[in-house]
Amino acid sequence: MNRLPIRFEQVEGGIILLAASALYFILGNNPWLFFLLFFTPDLSFAGYLVNPRVGAVAYNLVHTLSLPLILIALGLTSQSLLFLGSFGLIWVAHIGLDRMVGYGLKYPDGFTHTTMGWIGKDKGKN
């Protein structure tokens, strides 16, 4: 299996993580809030308690850039909505970390089957 596209995605994830984090802190946002909310998107794992399909949909919904970019755009529209942009940056940074370490979007057959290959106990299936 040619892993070069996956490596590119991992490097891109690292750049996204660094850029979103840097922008968050350059804008003078609260560091404690960043660390407190950084793993909030992983609450979507709770969907796996229902079944793998629901888990994959929940995980994928909060691990794509669409929703956090909407929050960032809303945060740019008004001073009173600035906190939404800050949360969006934290969310984007989290997604970047996941991609950097090889966690892609999930397939409905199980948590370990991702768009970037198999992870965890199933990693050898690549």
Question: Where are the predicted features?
Answer:
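N-terminal membrane-targeting hydrophobic helices
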Residues: 1-126
